[in-house]
Amino acid sequence: MKKILFYIIIFVIICFGIPILFTNKKDNTKEVSTIQENVQSNEQNEIKEYDYKQYNKIKLLHKQSTQVEEIPLDEYLYGVVSAEMPASFEKEALKAQAIVARTYTIYKIQNAKKHEEADICDDSTCCQAWISKEDRLAKWEESARQSNWEKIVDAVDSTKGKIITYEGKPINAFFHSNSGGKTETTVNVWGGSGYPYLQSVSTSGEEAYTQYKSEVTLNKQTFIDKIKEKHNEFEIDFGTQDCIKILEYTDGERVKKIKVGNLELSGVEIRTILGLKSANFEVIMDESDNITFKVKGYGHGVGMSQTGADSMAKQGSNFEEIIKHFYTGVEIQNI
């Protein structure tokens, strides 16, 4: 009887115990495997985003020749900074420009490549302006060539590896020449949902620069012809009151909406059609045959103002203070 009972117990253990044992082992193995995959995935993301060696060299498309050249990143940045910002600007402004250019380059490579065969091009209307050392030196006065180039190289080298991040990721670091006293949000320029770090901020000292003010005067027929090129249905009666009227302004004090005859257009479109330097303008119609646009600022107005950066540097701000003024809630990190 005891023997029978013993074998029954053994049989029960074999039938129920072993499956339970293997089931637990299988679940534990799966759990560990999942954790390892997640860790590996995170490590790969970190390497992709922050391994500086990955960006030691870039492929640069020369738009005019259509040739693609592979060059060291820092050498490329020398060409960008020297093409985009005057060497006469303050050192801290040049450093800020170097970090902005580096960030913009890496953001483009990771998120917004426009060229299949290259990382970025040398056309400022598409990517960033770039100029070779030889061409840049040739355009400077001989007496200033060495000192100017040394300032450019120092701006890039002294900020080596530094980029601007928002929540740990490289930002889309837009910049422009002169904000006219206040920068703009991306939503008011290009639409879309915008970026939280590209908000409208005030900038002092820009009125001292030649880019701050400009004027465009057109006779009425030229004005009509230019708008009709884009909008064939355009009609206007200059004898009526408010035939041209600004309807709404943006946070950055630019024209958001403007009534022009029978059309309602954005300030950005009027800027493009008429070749204005900014969408921050006022319209003056006198008794003559002319229409004058008085413009403040130069460029789209989004991100860092270059003259604003130089003005801040002259007032004692360093590159970090400049960057954090123009880009809201960002950090400067090493890649």
Show where each model-derived region lies.
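Extended substrate/cofactor- or partner-recognition/assembly subdomains adjacent to catalytic sites
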Residues: Y107, N111-N290
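Hydrophobic membrane-insertion alpha-helices, especially the h-region
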Residues: F6-L21
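Sec-exported extracytoplasmic/periplasmic mature domains
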Residues: S82-P86, I99-N111, G161, K228, ...
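C-terminal soluble interaction/assembly domains
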Residues: S266-I335
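N-terminal, intrinsically disordered, polar/charged segments of Gram-positive cell-envelope systems
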Residues: F22-Q67
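Acidic/histidine-rich, surface-exposed loop or edge segments in extracytoplasmic proteins
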Residues: I71-E90, S200-Q211
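Soluble non-cytosolic domains of exported or imported proteins
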Residues: V68-I71, S88-I99, T217-Q221, G299-G303, ...
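Positively charged n-region of N-terminal signal peptides that target proteins for export
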Residues: M1-I4
